[in-house]
Amino acid sequence: MPALSSRSGSEMGLYELLSVLPSQLQPHVESPDDRSFLHAMFGERSLHSLVKIHEKLQCYEDCAPTPVLDSAGSLAADLTEELQARSASNEIRELVKLLSKPHVKSLLSVHDTVAKKSYDPELPPLPDDIDDEEDSVKIIRLVKNKEPLGATIKKDEHTGAILVARILRGGAADRSGLIHVGDELKEVNGIPVDDKKPEEIIRILSQSQGAITFKVVPGIKDEAQSKEPKMFIKALFDYNPAEDKAIPCKEAGLGFKKGDILQVMSQDDATWWQAKLEGDGNLRAGLIPSKHFQERRLAVWRPTPVMTLQRTSSKRFSGLRRSFRLSRRDKKTNKSMYECKKSEQYDTADVPTYEEVTTYRRKHGDRHRLVVLVGPTGVGLNELKRKLLISDTQHFSVTIPHTSRSKRHQESEGVEYHFISKNLFEADIQNNKFIEHGEYKGNYYGTSFDSVRSVLSKNKVCLLDVQPHTLKHLRTAEFKPYVVFVKPPCIERLRETRRNAKVISGKDDKTSSKAFSEEDFLEMISASQMMENQYGHLFEKVIVNDDLTVAFSELKQALKKVETEAHWVPISWTHS
């Protein structure tokens, strides 16, 4: 949002800020009705008057003298009692007489009240003969312009009461969230409506402009409907209520980090839910933005993405031939290895807020969860996968890729590749049978969903490393992927530990290696940050590959827990 002014908030003042807000907000409001509503609300005279009063009081509060103490009345009483016990000189008698005067006592009492800021009136005790069934009354003030109120009313045939019959979504009443179906209408702008017909009340409403004041008796809520089932959600973004200008009370807000599990306690408010952090001993719920509200905000805040396709003409295999990956290193060709236009559009439309989750523990006999490794080129995915395979060949396995090129003499079907015709490969692409695919020298290469199913059907853990934008195709109840993001250490550690290491590059099956360059390190860091920023909400485990042995031990321990312990997964994965 553009800056409101080059002046600071204290120099501008709340009143001046209020006057420029409509013009500043206009570029960000698409609906003409919403623009009209904002102009009417900010142009309301009573609102401007309240702001002026607020500024006057604020100015006085800033320069007002600070009271020395807030017990002047009791101090004067103690002094009077002390003086009366002393010898009765003329000065003492005069002072005692002065302090005993009612107006002096009242003055000191007012002083103490102001010093303590005890402005709220003391309510009398409730009478003993109070009617428990007496209705409570709510005063509601709505600001509307020429648009309809967005609510219909009816007259109860038995009691004659005027009731709210329907709330139209998107109308002024709906946006306010203050008027509900079943509320009894008692007054409109101070005019009693008990003896009026609905048509007369509608006429009063249609003739009213600006602010409309309602006196209503809230309807009785259905207790069965107000009881909400227990719901757990995974936070897909970081949230700090202290930085949220929209939250009604910052002190009541609940902060959380991406990946935290929250228990939603109430969704009564469409904008602010009440939730608790799972596992937190604090029993008090806090306010968090609702899913719909946060999605709307992120959609407004999110900049329009600039699509950058990865260009390459070379293809690389991840150490073992069965692990299919596409290279991005050769920039001489304009041919895109990935058909990523469709997936890019999906990613920009996907606004990460919350995901409803539940606990899942793999039962004996169930298929293993698919293990997906994600990371930038050169970070060491291939080495980690190779070490896992060597550690237990009966437990871990990888997929066999498909290709449209001809089989060579030393190759066997289903060992190095699944060899299929180009026409069949293109048909499988159209039928979305590939997780990812690419083309090199006129031949297609790809990893199919069936190849993953083949590994899982053998009761083995399938190890797969893919580009992060393909994760959306794998996040299904069938695969229940456990996504591990492997990131590089800081660039200083990369220079220390990988300066003499080799990065694999290859053309077709002929692999070669070369030393890491400074450009490789910078590209690795940059790609890692991009992946984490854009897809971090999909990662269940993040491992920093500073030391390969340590990283491998951490990965193997995490995979052991996946098989033996309960984990939070999307609730949709357990409903299929």
Swiss-Prot record:
Domain SH3: 228-298
Main location, first listed in the record: membrane
GO cellular component: adherens junction; bicellular tight junction; cell-cell junction; plasma membrane
Result of altering R453H: In hmp; leads to vertebral ankylosis
Entry keyword set: Cell junction, Membrane, Repeat, SH3 domain, Tight junction
InterPro entries cross-referenced by the UniProt entry: GK/Ca_channel_bsu, Guanylate_kin-like_dom, Guanylate_kinase_CS, L27_C, L27_dom, L27_dom_sf, MAGUK, P-loop_NTPase
Organism: Danio rerio (Zebrafish)
Function: Acts as an important adapter that promotes epithelial cell polarity and tight junction formation. Involved in the assembly of protein complexes at sites of cell-cell contact.
Gene: mpp7
SMART domains noted in UniProt: GuKc, L27, PDZ, SH3
Stored Pfam families: Guanylate_kin, L27, PDZ, SH3_2
PROSITE patterns for this protein: GUANYLATE_KINASE_1, GUANYLATE_KINASE_2, L27, PDZ, SH3
Keyword Membrane on entry: yes
Residues of the PDZ domain: 139-220
Bilayer topology annotation: Peripheral membrane protein
Compartments, as annotated in UniProt: Membrane; Cell junction, Tight junction; Cell junction, Adherens junction
Protein name (Swiss-Prot/TrEMBL): MAGUK p55 subfamily member 7
Domain of life per record: Eukaryota
Every L27 domain range: 10-64, 65-122
GO BP: protein localization to adherens junction
Family named by the database record: Belongs to the MAGUK family.
Domain Guanylate kinase-like: 368-560
Signal peptide: none
